[in-house]
């Protein structure tokens, strides 16, 4: 939304000047200067105009109508975000259950049931490297190849798996949900800038290293970690909704494999010509809202009997 369009539109709302409008919505003069310099106005202002338009009987105005159309995706996102706290709680509880099962009780103290040290920060660092390796960053081979966006999204889910574990090591589930909730409201990019995506992913490693070396306090670094992670998701085109679906999917498929003989070697990984993870993603794509139990049941329906 352009600043000059805003000036035209607010007149249709009954405001005499831009100053009257910004005073009404409670922004500062420095905000206005920034909008004017960039000739761009934040999305939230478009949303306010949309709400005001609904309150008044207004004449037709092309600029105003275009602003309303622009802000509708945000309005839809905000409506969808009402379910995010529940989805976050489900993911954190599933992650805690998984960690309790694989690492034993009291894994939050930094050691698993075998006495092995747990280092979630190093896990994140390694997954970031795998994400970057899914892009054509190498100057010595495959220089013209395309980034594997599907695998990049999977790697982001793996990073999320370890980031949630790190957060749970430092705090409890309700506090974890509260910390994350405001960060996961964003619009995923449609045009992916691969170089920018790699740079944003590398910052996750920098934060992990800064915490590990004591340059950032452990708990204080969590907010920066969360913010940077969702920046990576946004620039990589991974919406929170799809992140949640993929996380539930991977968690559910791992449980399904264990329940059907994965450790014993009797598990069937290819289902009617397709690998189980491909089937899992196709099932997710047809589910508007995903829950662990519902997905598990659908995997049961698709699993070959022999």
Language model features: what each stretch is:
Residues 40-61:
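DNA major-groove recognition helix of helix-turn-helix/homeodomain DNA-binding modules
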Residues 12, 27, 221-225:
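Short acidic alpha-helix initiation/capping motifs at coil-to-helix transition points
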Residues 15-34:
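Short alpha-helical DNA-recognition segment
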Residues 76-306:
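Flexible "arm" and connector segments at domain edges
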Residues 56-80:
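Short, charged recognition helix plus adjacent turn
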Residues 7, 36, 49, 53, ...:
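Residue-level detector of alpha-helical secondary structure
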Residues 1-14, 77-80:
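A short, Lys/Arg-rich alpha-helix, primarily the initiator
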Residues 3-10, 24-27, 51-55:
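Secretory-pathway ectodomains
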